[in-house]
């Protein structure tokens, strides 16, 4: 069973979802099934079928989250440091073409969210950045072609989820 990195904040978020599913959603689905059963014939009972489908979804998500949390290697980013980019880094880059600054946080695959500038350690941009230092030029293959960036800053700080 392979381990994978995740920030401590990302892990807490997954654990919170898991607890909610186990203690709130699971109970609600059971109540929905019991209520639908009370309506009689189950063979043509749309409410019953919908409740059973939701139960299957909830149970699958619980199993998935249990697997993820069991394999997680929790990393406290605030305790990291260094001059090169690794998991947990917050990196500021300058796009060589547009000269615009962009910032990315390198996180685990289950906490990535590009709208919040959190990129997975397995993403092309993160793979290109790993091991680089301030002043290095990084080339990243994108759907629009190769993009070139200069590394401006590297920080290790807690993320807010």
UniProtKB/Swiss-Prot annotation:
HAMAP family: GreA_GreB (MF_00105). The keyword Kinase does not apply. Gene3D superfamilies: Transcription elongation factor, GreA/GreB, C-terminal domain, Transcription elongation factor, GreA/GreB, N-terminal domain. Necessary for efficient RNA polymerase transcription elongation past template-encoded arresting sites. The arresting sites in DNA have the property of trapping a certain fraction of elongating RNA polymerases that pass through, resulting in locked ternary complexes. Cleavage of the nascent transcript by cleavage factors such as GreA or GreB allows the resumption of elongation from the new 3'terminus. GreA releases sequences of 2 to 3 nucleotides. This is Transcription elongation factor GreA. Pfam families: GreA_GreB, GreA_GreB_N. The gene is greA. Belongs to the GreA/GreB family. InterPro entries: GreA/GreB_C_sf, TF_GreA/GreB_CS, Tscrpt_elong_fac_GreA, Tscrpt_elong_fac_GreA/B, Tscrpt_elong_fac_GreA/B_C, Tscrpt_elong_fac_GreA/B_fam, Tscrpt_elong_fac_GreA/B_N, Tscrpt_elong_fac_GreA/B_N_sf. GO terms for biological process: DNA-templated transcription elongation; regulation of DNA-templated transcription elongation. Residues 43-68 form a coiled coil. One of its GO terms (molecular function) is DNA binding. The keyword Ligase does not apply. Keywords: Coiled coil, DNA-binding, Transcription, Transcription regulation.
């Amino acid at each position: 069973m392979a381990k994978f990195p995740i920030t401590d904040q990302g892990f807490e978020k997954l654990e919170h979802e898991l607890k909610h599913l186990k203690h709130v959603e699971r109970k609600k689905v059971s109540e929905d099934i019991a209520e639908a059963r009370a309506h009689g014939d189950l063979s043509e009972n749309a409410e019953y079928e919908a409740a059973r489908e939701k139960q299957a979804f909830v149970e699958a998500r619980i199993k998935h989250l249990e697997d993820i949390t069991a394999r997680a290697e929790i990393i406290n980013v605030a305790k990291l440091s260094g001059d090169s980019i690794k998991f947990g880094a917050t990196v500021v880059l300058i796009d060589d073409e547009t000269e615009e600054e962009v910032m990315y946080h390198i996180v685990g695959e289950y906490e990535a969210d590009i709208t919040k500038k959190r990129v997975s350690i397995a993403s092309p941009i993160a793979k290109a950045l790993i091991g680089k230092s301030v002043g290095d030029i990084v080339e990243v293959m994108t759907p629009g072609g190769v993009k070139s960036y200069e590394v401006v800053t590297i920080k290790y700080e807690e993320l807010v989820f």
